[in-house]
Amino acid sequence: MTNTISIKLLNCLARGVQSLGDEARQRVTAFVESQLSAGGGFCDKSGRRDIYYTSFGMLLALVLGIKLNTMRMDDYLQQIDADDLDLVHYAAYKRCCMLNHLAKSKVGFAVKALQREPIRELTSFTAYPNNDMLSPYSQFIIYSLLEDTNNPTPQVALSSYRTADGYTNTPNGQAASTNATAAALMIKGQSEGYDNTEAILLRNMQHECGGFKAEPSTPMPDLLSTATALFTLSCYNVTPQYSASEFIEAHWLDSGGFAATILDSESDVEYTFYGLLALGAL
């Protein structure tokens, strides 16, 4: 049985944590703890509690050994109107519910995977990434949501998003993007098996500095695109063309968190997640 995307992410994050020395781990842990809201949940860059950021924070807390107050987290989750969320935030909400349930019940993912959770009808969402329910990124979010809640995963048709160089989030688009290609490859890997010849397109997108650009026209590589690409390549057991170690380290800030690009001076739990994910995928 193939591990879910969430389990693969956690395993990769754990490897990222294991790659840190004691001092580095303490700095990252302190930063993640600083992003916790007193009332439960994690904050965005502006300091406001946010369910999207909370999903990253809870995954980080799990691999860093940060003990969360599950009662406060329950209170926070119960305040959220799940029926009013868009797809991305709803998937984050359901992942948070799953992680908090696991923390309270002390059961593993294998036991949790036996339990099916009801979810909203997928057609009930009015907002999708790229305004397209069928794009690779939207389908990746849906696939992960269905896995997390142990609901049947569908066959996904992505041929209209395929280009000569990879995948795009626009039907019949011309320029492949890193994140659309990584999303498409993760869906194909989960549903059809991880054939490493499929990942060569993604491998070819790497910049010689070690990072990946979001799109060919983007001025510079960023940490999110790099982490998602490296994670996907690791799932396919494909080695990147260039070492990404120095690129990742350049995004680690004195605060203990990671920045989106080398031009950014602030961090949050989302990009700290991507920093550790990238390290774990090396």
Predicted regions and their residues:
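Long, well-ordered core segments of solenoidal/helical folds
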Residues: 21-40, 68-85, 106-129, 148-169, ...
